[in-house]
Amino acid sequence: EIPLRLVGSEMCIRDRFKNHPKGLLPAALANMGERFGFYTMMAILTLFLMSKFGLDKTNAGIIYSVFYFSIYILAFVGGLIADKTRNYKGTILTGLVIMAAGYLLIAIPTPTPVRNLPLYLTVTCIGLFTIAFGNGLFKGNLQALVGQMYDNEKYGKMRDSGFSLFYMFINVGAIFAPMVAIGVRNWWLSTKGFLYNPDLPELCHGFLGGNLSPEASERFAALAAEVSSNGAPIDMAAFADSYLSAFATGFHYAFGVAIAAMLISLVIFLANKKSLPDPRQAQAAGTGSRIDPGEVRMAAKEVRQRIWALIAVCAVVIFFWFSFHQNGLTLTYFAKDYTRLSIGSLGLSAEIFQSMNPFFVVFLTPLVLAFFGMMRARGKEPSTPAKIAIGMGIAAVAYVVMMLGSLGVPPAAEVERMGGLSEAQRVTPFLLIGTYLILTIAELFISPLGISFVSKAAPPQYQGCLLYTSPSPRDVEE
């Protein structure tokens, strides 16, 4: 199964999956559609909260963090529901429908600037909670079904590479999601006669609130003239209202793309669900009871040992999760405030850097698989805990690079007083690109192999909920 070739036709894709269970490809495609929708939202979430509601970075970050916390907690709940009912497929379908409803709540355009902040911010948070709950019903349980495919001895040795393929498909969707979000937002701005500028939403809110310094006011006027197709605006308050409305509405329409992605994922899953394992049918064909034969054979002592092993692994990799989840928060803030948004004549948006990680995952996965395959052939493949330890060390290197590259940049308070940095004062975009490259290498040592490890170690009766404890930030955050 190694190495993988990333270009090609339907036959090329089939060749990669030839030695794997036939349900792996539809599961990966359904997951890719759902992840595409999720990453469309995550690429713009914090920037949407700031531009729509005028939140500062701290409060936008709190909502972002609580949302992620909800994803993990509700994922555990979703896993418990599926493990209790053994109806994994029904739980997955329900999750897709609930997620679509959540995206609908945040996709409906509402007045901007927001005059009734408590009402509309509450509606947005309810939408995010709904997405998190639907995500909890969907993600871990789909992974559990994939893991059950490899419980068959015929495919057991292919488990790690199978989950790596599954993981790579997640990232195919994640590559294009930020691009689509940017394209929809910028298209809507253009229909209103505006160009994109990352600093203007914050300046508009500052102007309307009377909070701009003289330097920031001067920059606000200059940028307003630069982005307006009809020349420099005379009424700056009207410009601020119009620009904020166009900017936020473009984000609302980008969230609408996520709804379409959920529906596509739903169709793929429904069309192929017969090829996926069904634990309830296995029970009926076996003992006729609600308890799997595998569960009967596993003693309580072994269950405890497996759970403690998983807890030990998670207690270590939680520090990797801390670093990884900065991609939608502090690294996005850094892209917006400190990074030069151009490479030569190519203009960039702050959100585009979130495509770097999945891009590198897709193109580095074959190399990592080939490396592990070569080591396995020589009998020298590192154990899963060793791979995780290596990955965490590589992740630390990524942030050392980031730290060294950002030495000397002005503090945030100074940037705010100035109304943003000029292009000449910003750092090269290759700093973030390089950081994402190194962080992705670390991720590939941890994430797909972590899902595989948990699918093997989790007691059968707890697979749905425990697969969400796997060392896999992208697949959960997601």
What kind of region is each of these model predictions?
Residues 97-116, 394-411:
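C-terminal ends and interior cores of transmembrane alpha-helices
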Residues 9-10, 14-22, 152-160, 181-349, ...:
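Intracellular loop-helix junctions on the cytosolic face of multi-pass helical membrane proteins
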Residues 84-96, 374-390:
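Cytoplasmic membrane-interface "Motif A"-like loop-to-helix N-cap segments
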Residues 119-138, 419, 427-442:
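Hydrophobic core of transmembrane alpha-helices in multi-pass small-molecule transporters
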Residues 20-43, 310-323, 437:
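Pair of pore-lining "gating" transmembrane helices in MFS-fold secondary transporters
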Residues 164-178, 470, 474:
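Glycine-rich segments within core transmembrane alpha-helices of 12-TM secondary carriers
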Residues 65-80, 359-367:
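Central cavity-lining transmembrane alpha-helices of secondary-active solute carriers
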Residues 1-8, 13, 468, 473-478:
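Single conserved hydrophobic/aromatic residue that forms the stacking wall/gate
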